[in-house]
């Protein structure tokens, strides 16, 4: 259900702005998206896991707030990020 250390490092390397960037909004969105995708796969076989479903909703809300922040500050970065992550636009 959680992501491995190697996968997290790969996401950081892919979405980082600078070499030592581990906490930028784009990196955080990429990691949250990976966790959301993992939980979505988990629910395909564990549909009664309501506690984790609430955790999923918390993660989706956190990602939505980060995407709104990116959209407010840099629209081009936002559009590039959602196309790379394969998610829809935030309303």
Curated annotation (Swiss-Prot):
Keywords associated with the record: Ribonucleoprotein, Ribosomal protein, RNA-binding, rRNA-binding
Protein's job: One of the primary rRNA binding proteins, it binds directly to 16S rRNA where it helps nucleate assembly of the platform of the 30S subunit by binding and bridging several RNA helices of the 16S rRNA. Forms an intersubunit bridge (bridge B4) with the 23S rRNA of the 50S subunit in the ribosome.
One GO-annotated biological process of the protein: translation
Subunit structure: Part of the 30S ribosomal subunit. Forms a bridge to the 50S subunit in the 70S ribosome, contacting the 23S rRNA.
Gene Ontology terms: cellular component: cytosolic small ribosomal subunit
GO molecular function terms noted in the UniProt entry: rRNA binding; structural constituent of ribosome
Annotated Pfam families: Ribosomal_S15
rRNA-binding recorded as keyword: yes
Name of the molecule in the record: Small ribosomal subunit protein uS15
Keyword Nucleotide-binding attributed: no
Family: Belongs to the universal ribosomal protein uS15 family.
InterPro entries found in the cross-reference section: Ribosomal_uS15, Ribosomal_uS15_bac-type, uS15_NS1_RNA-bd_sf
Top-level lineage group: Bacteria
